[in-house]
Amino acid sequence: MKKIFFAVMSLFIGTFAFAQQNLMGTAVELNSPDIHEDNSVTFRVYAPKAVTVRLTGDFLPHHIADNNGYVTEVPIWVDMKEGKDGIWEYTTDGPLAPELYSYMFRIDGLPYADPSNPFRHRDMTVWTNYFLITGEEGTPGYMYDVNDVPHGNVERVWYDSPTLGLNRRVSIYTPPGYEDSKEKYPVLYLCHGAGGDENSWLDFGRASQIMDNMIATGKAKPMIVVIPNGNPMAAAAPGDWHAGLYKASMSGAPNPETKAKATIPEAFPDLMKYVESHYRVLKGAKNTAMCGLSMGGGHTLQTTAMYPDKFGYIGLFSGAVFQNDIEKLAPLFAKNPKVYLVACGTADPIAKFSFDFADALKAKGYPHETLWTDGAHTWKNWRHYLMVFAEQLFK
């Protein structure tokens, strides 16, 4: 028992000493990323014993690579240069456009986050740093920033899903002024991709900032945004429910033996019932939209097909969609949805599915829009698609 006590105390003291070292300013403190006046950026990391230090980020040139059998674009790795006192640096070749960017280091072959940058996001099990190049109104850098505009509120609430046998968590954005009025609002259901959760669109997706800024600039109507957890075996994000601190995975299950009692589309009425009974929402297809990225695009397709009288606006972003899904859509298109958007990056490893699906929609004579952009399976594209979609809603 004494050995355990002293081991724990040693760990505590060591951790406390490290924290005090940072508080007292005796650790190496660097400005990284260092955004210059011309919007070029310098990255720095202290690695005095390293042999090689490299950097990758979505602001760097991309090259074609094989990703688990799918051909896609990925950013290159660049070498950082060692300077004095063991500090390695890299400066971009020129200014970066206003946008939200992510990056990471590789020190002697091992991935590292930037210890000088506290802003990080998790994509399944991978953590990367991010930074924002701000810009003029209307630019991505402006739309993803926290500007001096009226702000909505975000709450994470729990609702009962008898279909899944779980008490589940959902993130809900209410627009500016919601608390001070009796007005009712239309609803957008916004779905994440595989490996994500109810936090994803709020973290690197910047959904609340996008909605605040779009509403403030008149580009979008005030609306409630519902961001569910799309993993039928999970109640909430890893570590935020009673399954404990488990590792995130593509399936979203806390362990491989976990089986879902139903699918997310089958359980959707549980969520809609909660939203419509706890929030001031305008009901009906003309006041209800749904969109999602990747797996969430598949959930959007399946859910809107399963409940064709519920949705008037549908958006599939790099969606997990397939040509044979088209056979399920006749009841939905008989209701004449106002918007049916299919969006994807031309370098996305699953772009062919979106292209083929759009061709099948056209062959059936189903009214729809397509949005093909540069880039791959990335948040840069999905944030843009959300803005394009949100601007068309409820008008």
For the regions a language model picked out, list residue spans one by one.
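Bacterial Sec-dependent N-terminal signal peptides
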Residues: M1-Q21
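Low-complexity, intrinsically disordered/propeptide-like segments
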Residues: V8-M9, G14-T15, T26, P33, ...
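N-terminal edge beta-strand
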Residues: Q21-N39
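Non-catalytic cap/lid and distal C-terminal segments of serine-dependent acyl enzymes
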Residues: I35-W77, K81-K395
